[in-house]
Regions:
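Generic secondary-structure signature for well-ordered alpha-helical cores
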Residues: 24, 53-57, 82-83, 106-109, ...
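Short Gly/Thr/Asp-enriched flexible loops that form oxyanion-binding sites at enzyme active sites
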Residues: 47-48, 76-78, 97-111, 148
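Glycine/serine-rich anion-binding loops at beta->alpha junctions
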Residues: 86-104, 140-147, 279
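A glycine/threonine-rich phosphate-anchoring loop and its flanking beta-alpha core
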Residues: 110-224, 327, 334
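Active-site segments that bind and position negatively charged phosphate/pyrophosphate groups
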Residues: 211-352, 357
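C-terminal charged capping/lid subdomain of soluble metabolic enzymes
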Residues: 332-419
Length: 419
C-alpha cells in the first residue's frame, strides 16, 4: 500500500498579495519573515510584507539565510526564531530560505541537540515531537519545491557533507506560488531550477515501486519516500512534459507562459517526489555540492565556492539514467519522450539511452557545466565522491535496482565529462 501526503497550495499571478489574509486565517499575529539578502531587495518581499501589515500582522524580517544553507545557517535562524516569540513563520525566497525556515520552526518549537533530528547515519533521525507553528512558504524560484515537502537540506560544515531533516511536520501549512516572482531570475538559475524539477520528477517516476518495499512494523513508521506509486506517476510525467516543452525558451527568451508552466511543473514534481522520493542523482549530488572546491557559478551571489543544487544533481543524471534504464524500461522511455527525445523507431529498451542523450543535448543548449569536470572536480576526486555518496542510504535504497559501491564509482566516472 501507499499513502498520499498532499500540500495545500495557491497558484497564480498575484497570489502573493493574499499572504496577509492567509496568515490571519492561520492565527498568525506576530510572524518571522525569513528571506535572504538578494530577495530582501526585490519586489516579492515588499509585496509580502505590505500584505502582512495590511492585515494587521506584526512581522520581523530575518535576511541572514545563506545560499545553500549550512548547519551554521540553520542554528542562527533557530536562535532568531527562539528569541522572537513568534506565533507563525513566512518564508520568501528559494529552497535555501524555505528549508532554513522549516528547521528554525522545528528547533524553536522543540529545542534539542542539533543532530537529533538530522537524517541517519549522520544524525539520530528523531521524529519531531509534535506540531510546529504555522508556516506559509512563498517561493521565488521553482526548482526545489520545498513548499510541497517535509524536507530541509543543508551542508554540515565539519563533515563537508550535505544531509537533511525529514518529517511530515516540516511541510508548510500553505504554499503561495506566484509566477510573477520568477521574472528577475538569472538565466542560469532558471536552467538549474528546471533541471532540478526534471530530476525530482524523473527520479520519482523511476524509483523502486512501492510494491517492492517491506511494510513498516507500524503504520506510523511508513516513510515519506514510499517509492514510485500511481499518484506520484501522474504528477511526475506531466512535470517532465512541461520541462521538456518550456526549458530552452525559458532560459534564452522567456515569456510569461514559460515561467508559469515551469513553476507549475515544480509544484507537480514536488508533490510527486514528496510521496515517492528521489534516488541516485540526488544521492550523488550531496557529495558534489558538499565537497566543492572553487567553482563559482554564473548568476549566484555568494561569497564562497558552491555547486548549486540543481547543477549538482543534473551533472550526474545522464550517467544514472543510462544505468537504470534496464530496471524499468517503459518509464525511462516515457520520460525521454516527454523531454522531447526522438523516439520514432526506437524500442522500450532504448529508454535509458534516449533519455541520457536528450539530457546531454539540453544541458549543452542551456549552458550547464559539462559533468563533474565542469564544476571543478578531477579524476582523483572520484573515490571521495563515491565514499560520501554511498552513505546516503535513504536515497540509494530508493533506486530501481541495487547499486554496489563499485557501480556508484563507475557512475561518477561516467559523469566526469559528457562532450
Amino acid at each position: 500500500m501507499f499513502s498520499v501526503e498532499a500540500p495545500k497550495i495557491k497558484f497564480g499571478n498575484g497570489v502573493l498579495n493574499e499572504l496577509g489574509e492567509d496568515a490571519k486565517s492561520l492565527g498568525m499575529r506576530r510572524v518571522a519573515v525569513f528571506t535572504d539578502r538578494i530577495v530582501a531587495e526585490q519586489e516579492s518581499l515588499t509585496i509580502a510584507v505590505n500584505s502582512l501589515e495590511k492585515a494587521g500582522i506584526e512581522c520581523e524580517i530575518y535576511d541572514e539565510v545563506e545560499v545553500e544553507p549550512t548547519d551554521r545557517s540553520f542554528k542562527a535562524g533557530s536562535r532568531f526564531a527562539s528569541e522572537g516569540k513568534f506565533d507563525g513563520f513566512v518564508s520568501v525566497g528559494g529552497g535555501s530560505v524555505m528549508d532554513t525556515c522549516k528547521a528554525s520552526n522545528l528547533y524553536s518549537c522543540f529545542p534539542s541537540e542539533f543532530l537529533d533530528y538530522v537524517n541517519a547515519p549522520i544524525g539520530k533521525a528523531k521524529p519531531a515531537p509534535g506540531p510546529l507553528k504555522p508556516h506559509i512558504a512563498c517561493p521565488t524560484t521553482f526548482g526545489t519545491a520545498s513548499e510541497c515537502t517535509g524536507i530541509a537540506i543543508f551542508d554540515l560544515l565539519d563533515m563537508e557533507a550535505k544531509t537533511g531533516i525529514v518529517s511530515p511536520r516540516l511541510r508548510p501549512d500553505l504554499g503561495l506560488l506566484d509566477p510573477l516572482s520568477l521574472k528577475t531570475l538569472h538565466p542560469m538559475i532558471r536552467a538549474a531550477n528546471a533541471f532540478d524539477v526534471f530530476s525530482h520528477a524523473c527520479e520519482s517516476l523511476t524509483a523502486r515501486p512501492f510494491t517492492h518495499r517491506q511494510a513498516p512494523d507500524h503504520p506510523s513508521r511508513r516513510p515519506l519516500s514510499q517509492g514510485a506509486n500511481p499518484y506520484s506517476d501522474i504528477a511526475c510525467l506531466e512535470a517532465i512534459q512541461l520541462v521538456g516543452e518550456n526549458l530552452i525558451q525559458a532560459v534564452h527568451d522567456p515569456e510569461d507562459e514559460n515561467l508559469e508552466a515551469l513553476m507549475f511543473a515544480g509544484m507537480l514534481a514536488g508533490i510527486g517526489f514528496g510521496n515517492a522520493g528521489c534516488h541516485l542523482p540526488h544521492g550523488m549530488s550531496y557529495a558534489v555540492a558538499g565537497l566543492c572546491k572553487d567553482y563559482q557559478p554564473d548568476g549566484w551571489s555568494s561569497d564562497h565556492a558552491l555547486v548549486p543544487h540543481g547543477i549538482s544533481v543534473i551533472v550526474n543524471s545522464p550517467a544514472v539514467f543510462r544505468f537504470t534504464g534496464s530496471a524499468c524500461e517503459e518509464r525511462h522511455f516515457q520520460a525521454a519522450k516527454a523531454m522531447g527525445a526522438e523516439t520514432q523507431g526506437a524500442s522500450m529498451e532504448d529508454g535509458g539511452s534516449l533519455l541520457s542523450d536528450q539530457l546531454i543535448k539540453m544541458m549543452k543548449d542551456t549552458g550547464i557545466p559539462n559533468g563533474l569536470q565542469g564544476v571543478g572536480y578531477g579524476r582523483d576526486d572520484l573515490e571521495n565522491l563515491t565514499e560520501r555518496s554511498y552513505a546516503q542510504k535513504r536515497l540509494i535504497d530508493n533506486a530501481p535496482c541495487p547499486v554496489s559501491r563499485e557501480q556508484m564509482k563507475g557512475l561518477f566516472e561516467d559523469s566526469f565529462s559528457y562532450w
